[in-house]
Amino acid sequence: MKSSIPITEVLPRAVGSLTFDENYNLLDTSGVAKVIEKSPIAEIIRKSNAELGRLGYSVYEDAQYIGHAFKKAGHFIVYFTPKNKNREGVVPPVGITN
C-alpha cells in the first residue's frame, strides 16, 4: 500500500485549491475553494502540522469534497477533489478504505 498519494494523482481531479503561507495566511484560492475559503481549513492544517511535517501529506473530508493537503516550499496547498460516492477508480488516501 502506498504511504501517500503523489500530487500527480491528485492534480488531474482537482476542482479547486487553497494556498497558505508558513503562518497559515491565505495566499490564493481557485475553483470551488473560492466558495469554501472561509472554512476552518487553515485551523485544520495548523492542528495537523505534525502529520504534514512527518508525511508531507494529509487528508480532510466533508460532504462534497476531499481536501488533499501538501507542504511544499514553505507553503501549504490544499487541492480539492470531488467526493466519489462509490470510490470506484479512485485510489483511496492513506487510512481511508472503501
Swiss-Prot record:
Q: Which UniProt keywords apply?
A: Cytoplasm
Q: Which Pfam family would be a valid example here?
A: YNR034W-A-like
Transmembrane residues, as ranges? none
Q: Which GO terms describe its cellular component?
A: cytoplasm; cytosol
UniProt superkingdom: Eukaryota
Instruction: Relay the record's extra comment.
Output: Present with 2820 molecules/cell in log phase SD medium.
**Protein name per the record:** Uncharacterized protein YNR034W-A
